[in-house]
Each structure stands twice: as C-alpha cells, then as structure tokens.
C-alpha cells in the first residue's frame, strides 16, 4: 500500500514537472523571434508604442504578450502599375511603369506608424499616377515616341523625389509599355497610308520621266541612224541596201538550216524536181 502511494506521488510530481517544463518552453518560445536575411523588424510595445530602433538579422528576445515584432523585407523589389494620361494635344495614352524600390531602413518605425506593412501598395500607385499625368501633359502624343528618353528622365527624377517624401528609395524606373487611344491610332495609320501613297506617286512620276527620256534618246538614235543610211545610200547608190538584204537572207538561211523540223521549198512550179510540162 505504501509503494502505491509512493508511485502515485512520483507520477504526480513528474506530471507537475512536465507541465512546468511545458509552460517554461512555451514562454521561452514566445520570448524569441527570428529576423531572416534581407529583413528588418520593428517592435511594437503595448506601453511605449512603436520603438524607435530597428532590429537586424538573427534571433532576438522580446517580452511575451507585451511586445510584437513586425517584419519588413528591405531587399529591392519590383512594382508595376498602369496609368491613363492626357497629352498636351488632348490625346489619351496608356502607360505602364515598372519601379524597383526598397524602404529606407532607418525610417522603418516611422513607415510602420504612418503606412503600415503594405506601404508600397498605398504609396507607389498614387505617386506614380500623379507624376505620369504631370509629365505627359507637357508633351504632344507623337513626342512621347520621338522624345522618349527625355520623358523617361523627367518621370524618373520627379518620381524619385516624390518617393523620398515617403521614405522609399527607388533604384530603377522604366516605362515598359506605351499605347495610344483608338482615335489617335487611326490617325497615325491614315498618315502612314498617305505617306505610302505619296511615295508611290513619286515613284510613278520618276518612272514616267525616265521612260520619256529613254524614248527621246531612242528617237534621236533612230533619227541619226536613218540620216547615216540616207547619206550612205546617196553616196553608194542601192548597193548598200542590197548588201543589207543579202546579210538578212543569210541569217534567215542559217537559222533554217539549224532547225531539223523545217524544210525548204523553192519557189516556182517545179517544186523539188526540174520538170518542164512544156517538154
């Protein structure tokens, strides 16, 4: 009977010890938090509010239930947003802007107090649309293409300055897409068609002019040739014409001789045989 009481007492003490260890382990686990690489933590204290210091990478202690860590990713990340803006000549353009951003580490407690964890979603689209509309309004629609480097530079400078007011650093800014409204696109297409028609008409005129010049040169050559033949005939009589006729007949005969499918039939009534019906 005494051994049973000892066993029960031992098990009771063991259970109490296990419970105590469990409570201690839970308390210890609640007192630790880890900040991974490329991250920073901001502590919120229930009595003092947001603490001014920023906690770096590693495992750290806190007061359970009184302090809460909030983790920020401080690595450079991309953010893309679109904006529909009006140009100086009252055309609508669609622009897509990509920025690479990161928070200013020393100002993370203030960012948490004013903007929270999703600071980029609250700030970047707003200031991006504001800057794009302000810059695009200074250019005509066609200038956005011909002067694109200048437009990008103005957007970059204005957006970097505006983002710093919210403690956000921008490492890179690029206009990735630009498209015009349907009305302007039709006008550009009509202009291109008109330019192509003008080039085609210019080509037709140039071709006709070249053909006219060729006809004049050809007529002058034929006139000179006729004059030379006339002069030669006047000096040598009809002999030159007979010579040209003989040369032409010789060329025809040579051509016929090379063709196996052509038979030569002499003129006259006797055909191939020298027959005289009168004899």
From Swiss-Prot:
Pfam families: Band_7. The modification N-acetylglycine is found at residue 2. Mostly expressed in proliferative tissues, including vasculature, shoot and root apical tissues. Accumulates in dry seeds. GO terms for cellular component: cytosol; mitochondrial inner membrane; mitochondrion; plant-type cell wall; plant-type vacuole; plasma membrane. Belongs to the prohibitin family. Prohibitin probably acts as a holdase/unfoldase for the stabilization of newly synthesized mitochondrial proteins. The chain crosses the membrane at residues 7-28. This is Prohibitin-4, mitochondrial. SUPFAM superfamilies: Band 7/SPFH domain. Keywords: Acetylation, Membrane, Mitochondrion, Mitochondrion inner membrane, Signal-anchor, Transmembrane, Transmembrane helix. It is found in: Mitochondrion inner membrane. Component of a prohibitin multimeric complex in mitochondrial membranes. The gene is PHB4. The keyword Cell membrane does not apply. InterPro entries: Band_7 (IPR001107), Band_7/SPFH_dom_sf (IPR036013), Prohibitin (IPR000163). It comes from the Eukaryota. Residues 2-6 are mitochondrial matrix. Induction: Transcripts levels decrease upon imbibition but remains stable at the protein level. It comes from Arabidopsis thaliana. It is a single-pass type II membrane protein. Residues 29-279 are mitochondrial intermembrane.
């Amino acid at each position: 009977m005494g051994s049973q009481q000892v066993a029960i007492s031992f098990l009771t003490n063991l259970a109490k010890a296990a419970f105590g260890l469990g409570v201690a382990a839970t308390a210890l686990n609640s007192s630790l938090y880890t900040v991974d690489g490329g991250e920073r933590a901001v502590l919120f204290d229930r009595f003092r509010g947001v603490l001014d210091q920023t906690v770096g990478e590693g495992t750290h202690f806190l007061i359970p239930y009184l302090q809460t860590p909030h983790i920020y990713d401080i690595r450079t990340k991309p953010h893309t947003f679109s904006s529909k803006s009006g140009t100086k000549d009252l055309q609508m353009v669609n622009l897509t802007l990509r920025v690479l951003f990161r928070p200013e580490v020393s100002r993370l407690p203030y960012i948490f107090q004013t903007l929270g964890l999703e600071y980029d979603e609250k700030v970047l689209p707003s200031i991006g649309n504001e800057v794009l509309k302000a810059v695009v309004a200074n250019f005509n629609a066609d200038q956005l293409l011909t002067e694109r480097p200048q437009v990008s530079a103005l957007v970059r400078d204005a957006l970097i300055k505006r983002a710093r007011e919210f403690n956000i650093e921008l490492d890179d800014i690029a206009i990735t897409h630009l498209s015009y409204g349907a009305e302007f696109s039709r006008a550009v297409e009509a202009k291109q068609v008109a330019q192509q028609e003008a080039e085609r008409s210019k080509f037709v005129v140039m071709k006709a002019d070249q053909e006219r010049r060729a006809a004049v040169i050809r007529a002058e050559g034929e006139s000179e040739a006729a004059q030379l033949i006339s002069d030669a005939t006047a000096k040598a009589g009809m002999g030159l014409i007979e010579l040209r006729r003989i040369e032409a007949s010789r060329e025809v005969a040579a051509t016929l001789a090379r063709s196996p499918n052509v038979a030569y039939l002499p003129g006259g009534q006797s055909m191939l045989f020298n027959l005289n019906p009168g004899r």
